[in-house]
From Swiss-Prot:
Cellular localization per UniProt: Host nucleus; Host cytoplasm
Coiled coil segments of this chain: none
Transmembrane segments: none
Signal peptide annotation: none
Name listed for the protein in its UniProt record: UL84 protein
InterPro entries for this protein: Herpes_UL84
Region Disordered: start-end pairs: 1-48, 136-185
Extent of Basic and acidic residues compositional bias: 155-169
Pfam families: Cytomega_UL84
Family affiliation: Belongs to the HHV-5 UL84 protein family.
């Protein structure tokens, strides 16, 4: 099963015959195509596994080597040999299955190149890569010195105290606080610009197991003598937006479409300010005390307590917020309180476990110019909750270092039901939708922050949805292409796809901001910057990302070695691989 032609070591540099037969192909190309076909007779059946020849390229794009001795070195020795740990690993289909080689090291980009015959694409399942793979720390790796026994005992006692404090405050905390400012990594697989086969743009959690790439085979590919499959594999930094915090919006005019279900007065309002000086927290007794501190030291907080019987109105979702039963509550703030709150104020609900509906959410929060504060609370149910309803609305000035939505994310954006934050938010249809023709579905939510939203569609028969880039301060518009003559029907809560927010540093290419295609491609190029005269960057989805801003991917041996144990979370005798496989057929 080996492919032992030394002339095919670097397939990217040789001309490839594009079409077989006699249609405009020269004699040299015909002989070359026949030679390739004879060499590939032993490879007509999958699986195909990349496990051999490597080309390690430094970030500056100067050094390139095919020295097999690099494969026998430790990761540290490999990094020293290449001159930089930020490298590109290039894998080809040239391998020996009797003596598979393991590519150990840390890389920012893995390129897979494979030349196939058209009939090989008919095989439904092909393994492209199978290797133990681990991502680096998203927020930076930290090394600590070994602690003494006394330090370990002290640390253990502190851990117990912290654990008790966390258990006491567990009811007050929410998922937003526990995941605050945490970046995660996700694997991205996309075709290279010289690839004939264009699999669908795919994002995968970096967990062991088999991940499927789907690809549609064009009829033109069947007339080629050799078909090139070229993929780029890299890891993006992603971050999860807060789902239980709603920003305070300020407006000048009142809207009287919905009357206030209840009006609160000053006794139900509590204004306090948290003063943080030299890690000592104090509560200012009044607004006057709070005004003496600077904005950098002052964190004003307004708490609105509600324990009343309220009226409920039915809404179907949309701009007004989530669907279900909603109640509109108002409270008039004094001019001093409204001024002291300042900008960048977020609100969230604190529920009473005994008297609050568990599905109660904050759907909108608005402060008008005359000091009137109005907010809507919604619960997704058909029957009104029992009276009275008890909860607290807490408004707090804070700096959110994550993307946040203009209004409540529900019912459009839902956390993944599996609970894994690296799987992105689920984008669902809030109501039953029937389409006869192609349609643009607009979701009336904006997000803010220096991030890039990416919508990856879910596979659905009879429909085609392109990968869509979502820019800050804009609506999310999804294009649905209906291929079935009878149209398509989306039931309520149908899954459209997943939404990710990329936190890797990037620059936008204004010429191609939206990836309104089904088959996305990527390009590796060099760009001069103020920090580097020749910086290697990867362009994908209308954005360019420097390789150094991608998460490093560490390839380990199948058997865990002593120096690898400290880098793995669950130390086992054998590390499970991350496997990529391609399925040809309908997207």
């Amino acid at each position: 099963m080996p492919r032992a032609d030394p002339n095919l070591r670097n397939r990217a540099r040789r001309p490839r015959a594009r079409r077989g037969g006699g249609g405009g192909v020269g004699s040299n190309s015909s002989r070359h195509s026949g030679k390739c076909r004879r060499q590939r007779r032993a490879l007509s059946a999958p699986p195909l596994t990349f496990l051999a020849t490597t080309t390690t390229t430094t970030m500056m794009g100067v050094a390139s080597t095919d020295d097999d001795s690099l494969l026998l070195k430790t990761p540290d020795e490999l990094d020293k040999h290449s001159g930089s740990p930020q490298t590109i690993l290039t894998l080809t289909d040239k391998h020996d299955i009797r003596q598979p080689r393991v590519h150990r090291g840390t890389y920012h980009l893995i390129q897979l190149h494979l030349d196939l015959r058209p009939e090989e694409l008919r095989d439904p399942f092909q393994i492209l890569l199978s290797t133990p793979l681990q991502l680096g720390e998203a927020n930076g790796e930290s090394q600590t010195a070994p602690a003494t026994s006394q330090e370990e005992e002290t640390a253990a006692s502190h851990e117990l105290e912290k654990k008790k404090e966390k258990e006491e405050k567990k009811e007050e905390e929410d998922e937003d606080d526990r995941n605050d400012d945490r970046e995660r990594g996700i694997l991205c697989v996309v075709s290279n610009e010289d690839s004939d086969v264009r699999p669908a743009f795919s994002l995968f959690p970096a967990r062991p197991g088999c991940h499927i790439l789907r690809s549609v085979i064009d009829q033109q590919l069947t007339r080629m003598a050799i078909v090139r499959l070229s993929l780029n594999l890299f890891a993006l930094r992603i971050i999860t937006p807060p789902l239980k915090r709603v920003p305070l919006r300020r407006k000048a005019a009142h809207h009287t479409a919905l009357h206030d279900c209840m009006a609160l007065h000053l006794p139900e309002l509590t204004f306090e300010s948290t003063l943080d000086i030299n890690n000592v927290t104090e509560n200012a007794a009044s607004v006057a005390d709070a005004a003496e501190s600077t904005d950098a030291d002052l964190t004003p907080t307004l708490t609105v307590r509600v324990r009343h019987a309220v009226c409920w109105h039915r809404v179907e979702g949309g701009i007004s917020g989530p669907r279900g039963l909603t109640s509109r509550i108002s409270a008039r703030l004094s001019e001093t309180t409204a001024k002291t709150l300042g900008p960048s104020v977020f609100g969230r609900l604190e529920l009473d476990p005994n008297e609050s509906p568990p599905d109660l959410t904050l759907s909108s929060l608005t402060l008008y110019q005359d000091g009137m504060l109005r907010f809507n609370v919604t619960c997704d149910r058909t029957e009104a909750p029992a009276d009275p309803v008890a909860f607290r609305l807490r408004l707090r000035r804070e700096t959110v270092r994550r993307p946040f939505f203009s209004d409540a994310p529900l019912p459009y954006f839902v956390p993944p039901r599996s609970g894994a934050a690296d799987e992105g938010l689920e984008v669902r249809v809030p109501y039953e939708l029937t389409l006869k023709n192609s349609h643009t579905l607009r979701i009336y939510r904006r997000f803010y922050g220096p991030y890039l939203g990416v919508f990856v569609p879910h596979n659905r028969q009879g429909l085609k949805m392109p990968v869509t880039v979502w820019l800050p301060r804009s609506w999310l518009e999804l294009t649905v292409l209906v291929s079935d003559e009878n149209g398509a029907t989306f039931p309520r809560d149908a899954l459209l796809g997943r939404l990710y927010f990329i936190s890797s540093k990037h620059t936008l290419n204004r010429g191609c901001l939206s990836a309104m295609t089904h088959q996305v491609k990527s390009t590796l190029h060099s760009r001069s910057t103020s920090h580097s005269p020749s910086q290697q960057q990867l362009s994908v989805l209308g954005a360019s990302i420097a390789l150094e801003d991608l998460l490093p991917m560490r390839l380990a041996s199948p058997e865990t070695e002593p120096q690898d144990c400290k880098l793995t979370e669950n130390t086992t005798e054998k590390t499970s691989p991350v496997t990529l496989a391609m399925v040809c057929g309908d997207l």
